[in-house]
């Protein structure tokens, strides 16, 4: 997943203050200036967050391909891959290194859509909390409130991500598992989209929605919680260091308005990405298995053929089948490589985003 940068929280706080001042100001000019500031903050969040997410996607995508291939190994056959390194070797031997980037066009679009949606719905979640009187508009939200707004944002974003990830998974795992009759699916997004629509209609694009919902709602809540907790710890540490050097109280207060150093933002982002990926990885595994099943059918038929005639499995049915076949370990295939790649990927996303905000401000 692509992360939501910390500086947006200050932007939302300023936007809330702007809304509150609109109720008391007697002239139109200050309101226009403040409204424009809030709009430009939101625009920066969306544009720069999307750009950072796309860059991050290029970094993490080969690891994501390996993860999906590990997750989607068939129930009734011996495992194709003994682990991430073996999957890397076999994949590069079969398709070359660029084969690990198969299907990246849809996720690149998804990275931009995901970030834009996260910012938009997170803002709505904050507005709901402020409107309900949960917190004054000129104050920062508590960590528990940020968990809520993150989960709220992730839940709505999952509706956008499920079709994108469905197409991505179909392309990343192109061969039908098992035996004779396996065919090579066309490895371009448009043909895959047409095939899904022809066999399953519009509803078919949301196959695996429950898994995406669990992963995104829970994952985004964990993202905000981990990110803000780590950032808060760093701010306290920095303030104590200032006081130890003899800084005045005014200097300490002023330091709270400045963004954290990039390396601290990177660590906070890395911890958030690792929490997001680890905590709800089993739901992502079940989703990947659902989304790599044959188009028009529900996956293998126990090696008896006629796979495409089998009905699609629900989330619960797929989870039970995986538990029966591999136990708890089956739900964590590819987890290690996913958590490890999420640390540098999330850190890089934050560094790109904050660099763009600092050197190319829109307002």
From Swiss-Prot:
GO CC annotation, single: mitochondrial inner membrane
Region (Disordered): 1-26
Gene Ontology biological process terms in this record: L-arginine biosynthetic process; mitochondrial L-ornithine transmembrane transport
Residue ranges, compositional bias (Low complexity): 17-26
One Pfam family of this chain: Mito_carr
Keyword annotations of the record: Membrane, Mitochondrion, Mitochondrion inner membrane, Repeat, Transmembrane, Transmembrane helix, Transport
Gene that this sequence comes from: arg-13
Subcellular location per the Swiss-Prot or TrEMBL entry: Mitochondrion inner membrane
Biological function: Required for arginine biosynthesis. May participate in the export of matrix-made ornithine into the cytosol (Potential).
Transmembrane segments: 40-56, 109-125, 141-161, 208-224, 266-283, 334-353
Polar residues compositional bias, start-end: 1-10
Predominant place of localization: mitochondrion
MF term (GO), any: transmembrane transporter activity
Family recorded in the similarity comment: Belongs to the mitochondrial carrier (TC 2.A.29) family.
Source organism of the structure: Neurospora crassa (strain ATCC 24698 / 74-OR23-1A / CBS 708.71 / DSM 1257 / FGSC 987)
Protein name: Amino-acid transporter arg-13
Solcar repeats: 40-128, 141-233, 260-359
Keyword Cytoplasm attached: no
InterPro entries: Mitochondrial_Carrier, Mitochondrial_sb/sol_carrier, Mt_carrier_dom_sf
Membrane topology: Multi-pass membrane protein
PROSITE patterns in UniProt: SOLCAR (PS50920)
